[in-house]
Amino acid sequence: AFWRSVFDDYESDEFMFEISVPLRNDLAKGKKVVLHLAEDPEVRDTLFCIDSDFDYLFADQTPVSREINRTPHIFHTYAYATENYLCYAPSLHNICVKATKNDTNIFDFEKFFADYSRTIYPLFLWYAYSAQQESEHIFTLADFRASVRLNFLEIEHNGLRTLAWLRRNVARRDQALRERHAEMIEPKRAFAEKLFRRGVTPENTYLF
């Protein structure tokens, strides 16, 4: 459905797109498979659509991101995955209105996600940088998820208490990582500047 919504605007009398996904569970999946298929001259009329993960952000700094970004008929998201777009903050109020038939605005999604993003940004940098360096053991995806998960959400005051609780958890983990891996602090700062040039800011981290 996501990629259909992308390509619908480009259909014409000359161009038509048919979106298909593997139907059998035994079909091979993954980026290596896509890259192998993309080299086949018999599928030159096929566009391969994938989640970026970090390949867009890494900007040719890893072998896979180089290959993905230089293959002309591979489309990938700027965000980590298509699901990130479903959480696009400016759209969430309208989704609630459609679901509840009630337009009362009791929660500012845009402010909350900006505040949430600023809160988790330090740990996002640790995880993304360690992933680019192929040192995921320093701060694994499981550790990152556990560190930024919201165990409760206070609707009143737009999640103020929730974010305060999360901020304390993030600060503790960030401090522990700084003490354990002090040699990564300066390179990580330069890495953050590269991410900024790719569109990542402390306020929109939730998309990536």
Question: Model regions: which residues?
Answer:
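Acidic, divalent-metal-binding catalytic cores of TOPRIM
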Residues: 1-208
